[in-house]
């Protein structure tokens, strides 16, 4: 490997590797002849005449077809790619994870059971994917829509309260605000940090019983969707807190912006876990589209087949007599060769044409219908 080869591989459009110059016609013929001799177990020193042993090894490696990789990594355009397509965790990138590990399998998913009134988590379980899809999907969708609607109302109420608090606190004079800001300690990132789903879960793990002692209706949703909902609410809360900080102490905004960045990275990582599901669904949609196209083509061929059979049936219904038609054609030919003379010959020709007028009219009408239908 030449010293410049490693640098060339990392360019946007790398040039071909330098060993392509070895693929000359002479070397190819030598390698082919050597392979044939090795297959026949014959030793011939004149078959390959390399200069050194290193040239023998290099030619053997270059002209040998590489085997397909089954594991490990490979390089392409200077980047290293993995064959197993494993999604790295946030911890590997040095980013804190705000949710617990989700243990979803190929055929089963982790489900959270919680109380919609108090948002208290009762427990977690595992459910097969097909069983969860069959378990009243319409009712689950309605419950989730109602829950989202109530959550949006709660967010609006919280935002209104926070804005009112900010307005009430900004009413005093500027001097009092400056004194409060100077006397107040800097906001600690841990106190006003991102509201992680794990910490919120511990706070929400309260008793699911109501004041009357009766258990309310519980909802089961996938753990991933539950964590995404919590992270979205935490993101909204941190954004509202950022607005309050910008109104009171703008110099303290970096910690809150960092919290928002961590929340967005966690949301992005959770959403990326749906990529395999998205690829499967996209493949299913493409296959369904191809199937519909093939079915439409088959139906089109069937309609053309029906039209052709109907046309042939109409032709059969005319009931042509080939012997009589042959006689008529011969009489026409003879009349053309020998011009008609006299009133008797003229009457014979008229009677001959009048017999076949009806059949000719029917055939012409049928041909007109067929031509019009084909043109349309």
UniProtKB/Swiss-Prot annotation:
It comes from the Eukaryota. Residues 138-187, 204-214, 345-358 have a biased composition (Basic and acidic residues). One of its GO terms (biological process) is regulation of transcription by RNA polymerase II. Keywords: Activator, Nucleus, Transcription, Transcription regulation. One of its GO terms (molecular function) is transcription coactivator activity. GO terms for cellular component: core mediator complex; euchromatin; mediator complex; nucleus. Residues 138-215, 336-358 are annotated as: Disordered. It is found in: Nucleus. Residues 189-201 have a biased composition (Polar residues). Belongs to the Mediator complex subunit 7 family. Component of the Mediator complex, a coactivator involved in the regulated transcription of nearly all RNA polymerase II-dependent genes. Mediator functions as a bridge to convey information from gene-specific regulatory proteins to the basal RNA polymerase II transcription machinery. Mediator is recruited to promoters by direct interactions with regulatory proteins and serves as a scaffold for the assembly of a functional preinitiation complex with RNA polymerase II and the general transcription factors. Component of the Mediator complex. This is Mediator of RNA polymerase II transcription subunit 7. The lineage of its organism: Eukaryota, Fungi, Dikarya, Ascomycota, Taphrinomycotina.
């Amino acid at each position: 490997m030449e010293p410049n080869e490693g640098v060339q591989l990392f360019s946007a459009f790398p040039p071909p590797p330098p060993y392509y110059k070895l693929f000359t016609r002479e070397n190819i013929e030598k390698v082919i002849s050597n392979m044939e001799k090795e297959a026949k177990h014959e030793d011939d020193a004149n078959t390959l005449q390399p200069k050194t042993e290193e040239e023998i090894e290099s030619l053997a490696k270059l002209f040998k077809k590489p085997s397909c990789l089954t594991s490990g990594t490979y390089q392409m355009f200077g980047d290293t790619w993995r064959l197993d397509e494993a999604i790295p965790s946030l911890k590997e990138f040095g980013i804190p994870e705000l949710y617990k590990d989700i243990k979803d399998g190929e055929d089963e998913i982790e489900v959270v059971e919680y109380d919609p009134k108090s948002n208290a988590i009762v427990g977690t379980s595992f459910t097969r994917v097909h069983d969860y899809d069959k378990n009243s999907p319409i009712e689950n969708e309605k419950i989730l829509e109602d829950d989202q609607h109530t959550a949006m109302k709660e967010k609006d109420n919280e935002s209104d309260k926070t804005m009112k608090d900010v307005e009430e606190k900004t009413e005093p004079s500027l001097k009092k605000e400056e004194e409060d800001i100077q006397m107040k300690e800097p906001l600690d990132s841990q106190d006003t940090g991102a509201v992680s789903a794990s910490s919120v879960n511990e706070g929400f793990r309260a008793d699911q019983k109501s004041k009357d002692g009766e258990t309310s209706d519980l909802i089961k949703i996938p753990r991933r969707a539950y964590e995404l909902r919590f992270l979205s609410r935490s993101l909204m809360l941190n954004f509202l807190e950022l607005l309050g900080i910008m109104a009171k102490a703008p110099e303290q905004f970096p910690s809150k912006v960092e919290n928002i960045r961590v929340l967005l990275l966690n949301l992005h990582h959770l959403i990326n876990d749906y990529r395999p599901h998205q690829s499967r669904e996209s493949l299913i949609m493409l296959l369904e589209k191809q199937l519909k196209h093939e079915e439409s083509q088959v139906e089109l061929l069937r309609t053309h087949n029906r039209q052709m059979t109907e046309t042939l049936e109409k032709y059969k219904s005319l009931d042509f007599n080939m012997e009589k038609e042959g006689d008529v054609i011969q009489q026409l030919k003879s009349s053309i060769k020998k011009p008609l003379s006299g009133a008797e010959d003229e009457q014979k020709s008229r009677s001959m044409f009048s017999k076949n007028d009806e059949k000719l009219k029917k055939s012409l009408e049928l041909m007109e219908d067929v031509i019009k239908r084909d043109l349309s």
